[in-house]
């Protein structure tokens, strides 16, 4: 494998379905073999569009579960640059300010890039760049309870705002966009991010692709 090639694995599914956990598990276990600088994780959330030109009242009304809320074109460009051996500056997104921050995070080319995000499989151009894709098929009620706990504890949200957002956009957009994108996944993973067999299958697939 030359320095200008990389394997891109996408992990999609509902918010709080276990994407981050399985991505972290694969990252932690593969970096021992590949080296920390040879594997990286990119969160689709980093590519939410800049909303600094909007007031806070306008920002909170954005439908963050719709594909248009994300700059997939920039993500595609960054992945193409990484595959060609060039470093990129990944945006940083603030969940409390509902917009991008001024700083970015530099990512250098990697042998393995793990993408994780709710809407990754909805974009045909993104799918073309993936070497393998996964859909976390976790029941929506479990995802909601996890999301409620996480957003209140970690993202400065109120319980009322999380419930309201779930009713207005999260659940409807899951049914309209996210769940239908499951048809494009190579692997469908039940039981969340602690599914050890699914994790091992993914690791084996990555190792096979690296050996080509």
Swiss-Prot record:
Gene3D superfamilies: P-loop containing nucleotide triphosphate hydrolases (3.40.50.300). InterPro entries: P-loop_NTPase, PRK/URK, Uridine_kinase, Uridine_kinase-like. Keywords: ATP-binding, Cytoplasm, Kinase, Nucleotide-binding, Transferase. GO terms for molecular function: ATP binding; cytidine kinase activity; uridine kinase activity. It comes from the Bacteria. ATP binds at residues 13-20. It holds the Pfam family PRK. GO terms for cellular component: cytoplasm. GO terms for biological process: CTP salvage; UMP salvage. PANTHER family: URIDINE KINASE. HAMAP family: Uridine_kinase. This is Uridine kinase. The gene is udk.
């Amino acid at each position: 494998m030359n320095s200008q090639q990389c394997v891109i694995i996408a992990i999609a599914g509902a918010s709080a379905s276990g994407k981050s956990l399985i991505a972290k598990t694969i990252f932690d276990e593969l970096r021992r073999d590949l080296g920390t600088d040879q594997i990286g994780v990119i969160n689709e959330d980093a590519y939410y569009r800049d909303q600094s030109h909007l007031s806070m009242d306008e920002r909170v009304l954005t439908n963050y579960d719709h594909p248009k809320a994300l700059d997939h074109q920039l993500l595609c460009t960054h992945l193409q640059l990484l595959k060609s051996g060039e470093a990129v500056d990944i945006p940083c997104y603030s969940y409390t300010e509902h917009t991008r921050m001024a700083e970015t995070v530099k990512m250098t080319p990697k042998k393995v890039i793990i993408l994780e995000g709710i809407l990754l499989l909805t974009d045909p151009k993104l799918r073309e760049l993936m070497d393998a894709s996964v859909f976390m098929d976790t029941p929506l009620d479990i995802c909601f309870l996890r999301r409620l706990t996480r957003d209140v504890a970690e993202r400065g949200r109120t319980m009322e705002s999380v419930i309201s957002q779930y009713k207005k956009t999260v659940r409807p957009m899951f049914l309209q966009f996210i769940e239908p994108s499951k048809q494009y996944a190579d692997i469908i993973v039940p039981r969340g991010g602690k599914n050890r067999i699914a994790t091992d299958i993914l690791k084996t697939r990555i190792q096979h692709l690296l050996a080509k």
